[in-house]
Swiss-Prot record:
The gene is MPPalpha1. GO terms for biological process: proteolysis. GO terms for molecular function: ATP binding; metal ion binding; metalloendopeptidase activity. Heterodimer of alpha and beta subunits, forming the mitochondrial processing protease (MPP) in which subunit alpha is involved in substrate recognition and binding and subunit beta is the catalytic subunit. Component of the ubiquinol-cytochrome c oxidoreductase (cytochrome b-c1 complex, complex III, CIII), a multisubunit enzyme composed of 10 subunits. Belongs to the peptidase M16 family. It comes from Arabidopsis thaliana. The keyword Phosphoprotein does not apply. It comes from the Eukaryota. This is Probable mitochondrial-processing peptidase subunit alpha-1, mitochondrial.
Length: 503
């Protein structure tokens, strides 16, 4: 008996070996012959007779094959339609099975009058809550039913509401998205719940020194709307309510200031679904964005502790000056930086200017990184750092020295080529995400009225020279300094002393 079982096992092993050996472009007749000669070993082991076993090269009965991939996929083309009321609908098709759709509004904290401070922050948190047509529970269940994912974000100049799901659910996605933006109910208990969460969020901001300083230098560096807080001031939480949000939306959420953008959706399908839902939005001429003036300034908050956090920044042109905004982006990538401890493993970012010349040389510096905050007409470029209080003055001096060295032409071609390659790869990798692609469409149309081809951006990066980087940096650091410090700031030099380091 055992001998018989072993014999069958050895025979089965031979069958499996022959069955799993790949056929080299077998013809249909050869496949048929192979199928008829292959033993049905499962039946054989159970005592049945040898029968034909269907080849793995043949499709199973009742199972349809997916459509074959095209040999060549044409680049997606963007289509834009402007409705009579001024709202723009834009989309590009992709071979992805999923789609991302967003409603982008030319509205942010710069449009907040003092009475409305914190409105955009609260609107962001009230996104996809109860509407006049749906309870929050029903809305969540409908999004879950289509496997959707929603998000909202608010910035100083723009707001976005997005939804992501399989493209077979485009009608449902568009309807839920537009209902959530156009018809919020602003129920008192939902508003009060989000206000309580905002209070916690504001308290947590003080525990994030870099985020806190980046917010503070806008208030110190600008005069006008850009100095308004992006996060709601704690003093405004008692004043914010549903009626105030409705008033703010009525003033700012008009058709001419909205773009419905999608990635992975046929334009005609999107237009067919969205036009009836948005054509009755009021046709109001777009409001001119309020202007801000860069003035420079100093912000300090002493909280004690064992570290000093600082940020030094200067004004740079905004996205409407495309060449110089691109130069600022490449300069940020060239300067790079990071923390003394890299959570992503050793070697990450270590070829950047600040990493090689500051973090690797001075153990007292815990963090040193370049940053940008660019808007339509203006922006900030600077360096954030963190060190021990005793080393704070030296760390700030090092930040000034490195910017002066770049302005003095000490960057070589290898440094610039690495920064340009990193900039281009970051943009191209981000655009592989359909959600980022939809966001790019919406925000560019709000800014430029069109979407500029990515090749144009890449060409602008390629055209930058060492002289461009040096001249740009020299011009930037000649402007008034904006300075911020947080933590143990007792040893931080005066504003005039720091400003003189850049001259």
């Amino acid at each position: 008996m055992y001998r018989t079982a072993a014999s069958r096992a050895r025979a089965l092993k031979g069958v499996l070996t022959r069955s799993l050996r790949p056929a080299r472009y077998a013809s249909s007749s050869a496949v048929a012959e192979t199928s008829s000669s292959t033993p049905a070993y499962l039946s054989w082991l159970s005592g049945g007779s040898r029968a034909a076993l269907t080849s793995l090269d043949m499709p199973l009965q009742g199972v349809s094959l997916p459509p074959p991939l095209a040999d060549k996929v044409e680049p997606s083309k963007l289509q834009i339609t402007t409705l009579p009321n001024g709202l723009k609908i834009a989309s590009e098709t992709t071979p992805n099975p999923a789609a991302s759709i967003g409603l982008y509004v030319d509205c942010g904290s710069i449009y907040e009058a003092p009475y409305f401070h914190g409105a955009t922050h609260l609107l962001e948190r009230m996104a996809f809550k109860s509407t006049l047509n749906r309870t929050h529970f029903r809305l969540v269940r409908e999004i879950e039913a289509i496997g959707g994912n929603t998000s909202a974000s608010a910035s100083r100049e723009q707001m976005s509401y997005t939804i992501d799901a399989l493209k077979t659910y485009v009608p449902e996605m568009v309807e839920v998205l537009i209902d959530s933006v156009r018809n919020p109910a602003f129920l008192d208990w939902e508003v009060n719940e989000e206000l309580r969460k905002m209070k916690v969020e504001i308290a947590e901001l003080a525990k994030n020194p870099m985020g806190f300083l980046l917010e503070a230098i806008h208030s110190a560096g600008y005069s006008g709307p850009l100095a308004s807080p992006l996060y709601a001031p704690e003093s405004a939480l008692d004043r914010l309510n549903g009626e105030l949000l409705e008033e703010f939306m009525t003033e700012n959420f008009t058709a001419a200031r909205m773009v419905l953008a999608a990635s992975g959706v046929e334009h005609e399908e999107l237009l067919k679904v969205a036009e009836p839902l948005t054509s009755d939005l009021p046709n109001v001429p777009p409001q001119l964005a309020p202007k801000s003036q860069y003035v420079g300034g100093d912000f300090r908050q002493h909280t004690g502790g064992e570290a000093t956090h600082f940020a030094v920044a200067f004004e740079v042109p905004g996205w409407n000056n495309e060449k110089e905004a691109v130069t600022a982006t490449v300069l940020q990538m060239l300067m790079g930086g990071g923390g003394s401890f890299s959570a992503g493993g050793p070697g990450k970012g270590m070829h950047s200017w600040l990493y090689r010349r500051v973090l690797n040389e001075y153990q007292e510096v815990q963090s040193c990184t370049a940053f940008t905050s660019i808007f339509n007409d203006t922006g900030l470029f600077g360096i954030y750092g963190c060190s021990s209080p005793q080393f704070a003055a030296k760390a700030i001096e090092l930040a000034a020295k490195e910017l002066k060295d770049v302005a003095g032409g000490k960057v070589n071609q290898a440094h610039l080529d690495r920064a340009k390659a990193a900039t281009k790869s970051a943009v191209l990798m981000n655009l592989e995400s359909r959600m980022i692609a939809a966001e790019d469409i919406g925000r560019q149309i709000l800014t430029y009225g069109e979407r500029k081809p990515v090749d144009q951006f890449l060409k602008s990066v390629d055209q930058l020279t060492l002289k461009d980087i040096a001249d740009f940096t020299s011009k930037v650091i000649s402007k008034p300094l904006t300075m911020g410090s947080f933590g143990d700031v007792l040893a931080v030099p005066s504003y005039d002393t720091i400003s003189s380091k850049f001259r």
